[in-house]
Every structure is written in C-alpha cells, then in structure tokens.
Amino acid sequence: TVPETYMVRQVIKETGVVFQLGHQGRQTDCYQKAEEIIGNGLLGPVNLIEVCTNRNSPNGAWVYDIIEGSNPNTIDWKQFEGDPERIKEYMDYMTSNKLERYIGPDERSKFSLERFFRWRCWWDYSTGLSGDLLTHEYDAVNQIMHVGIPHSATSSGGVYFFKDGRTVPDVLQTTFEWPDRDLTMLYSATLASSRNRGKVFMGHDASMEVSNIL
C-alpha cells in the first residue's frame, strides 16, 4: 500500500540498511538499442507508445497451487495478516480514499487457503496488474525515452474472466499523458489471452516494436 512505502523509507533512513528495489529487464540490451534508435531520430517524433502484458494460464493469473495438507496448524495466519498497526494504517488509507468496496473486512480476518497461497488476487495484499506487471513495462519505456512521471494517468478494467472471488482486475487498461512532450502511452493487459503485442513506439517517420531480445 502507499502508506507502507513511506514506512519502508522511514526505516531505511533510521537504520541505514542497504535497500535495493529493481525492475525486470534492466539487463536487456535491446532497450539500450531502442534508446539509441529513437535518440538518433530514426522514428521521427514519437507521440504514441503501446505496451501490454497478456497472460493465459492459471499460474499467470496467480491461481497458484494450494499445497496439500495446509491448514491452520501448519500456517501462521497471524504473521500472514501482519502487524495490527499496519492493518489499521491500511484500513484508514482505504477508507479515506473511499475504497471500502475493495477491503472485504470479514474475509480478511478469516483463515483462507486461497488468500494465503493466491494473495496476489486481493487488494488487501497486492497491487494487481498495475504494481505486478505494468510497473515493469513502464520502467522499460522510461529506460528508452526517459519519460519520468506523467502529467496524468487514468485506468479502467474489472474482473471479467476469473470469477474466483478476487478483487484485483484481470483486465486493465491505463493511459498515461505527457502533454509537455506531446506523448501518450497506452497499457493494456488481460489474464485470459496469450496474444502478446509487444512494446510499440509509433513515430511520424517509422514505428518500432521492441522485444526482450535483440
């Protein structure tokens, strides 16, 4: 959650511990080549970027296997739920931002094998497609074009395929705008299709599709 990020930062400042957080694909040579191509003006002005992360498998949709024999005696549910103070901060944040419909308070405190093994499916513990997959695509674009923080971002989507009680969307579309750079980026994802459209940079003179390999 957002409050937790500030808590982590505060602990790092107070303790002086070394903390490293990264994205997937930082070692990818093709991003450096794509940056070079755009920097040399081969595409002309780039006004539209499209990225996606489609998946089409239970594991890709976070429906992980439940280990046989798992029960309240073999799982520390209180540890999984976390510190009461952290839970209170989370609840306060969700309430103040009028996100109560995503909390599911009755279910959160009830022992659940699905929630323990498939925690990514609930806002209570996860950031869903945006924080799990979109973040890597955004970082890739930022490596290539140094877009920084957008002027605005809007999202839409829902739970349209996996009707398993999850609260995070299995379909998501997000639009980022940089008016000062005359640039828009579109992100879309579905967990019910394996059609991968790659990363497409659309310029006035040419377009370029970027994969993870040269």
Annotated model-derived regions:
Residues F19-Q27, I38, I49-V51, A61-W62:
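Alpha/beta-hydrolase
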Residues T5-V11, D29-I38, S57-V63:
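Pocket-flanking alpha-helical
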Residues I37-N40, A140:
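A generic secondary-structure signal
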Residues T1-Q27, G41:
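Beta-strand-loop-alpha-helix segment that lines the small-molecule cofactor/substrate pocket
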Residues Q32-K33, P45, E50-N54, N59-L214:
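Contiguous beta-strand/loop segments that form the cofactor/metal-binding neighborhood of enzyme cores
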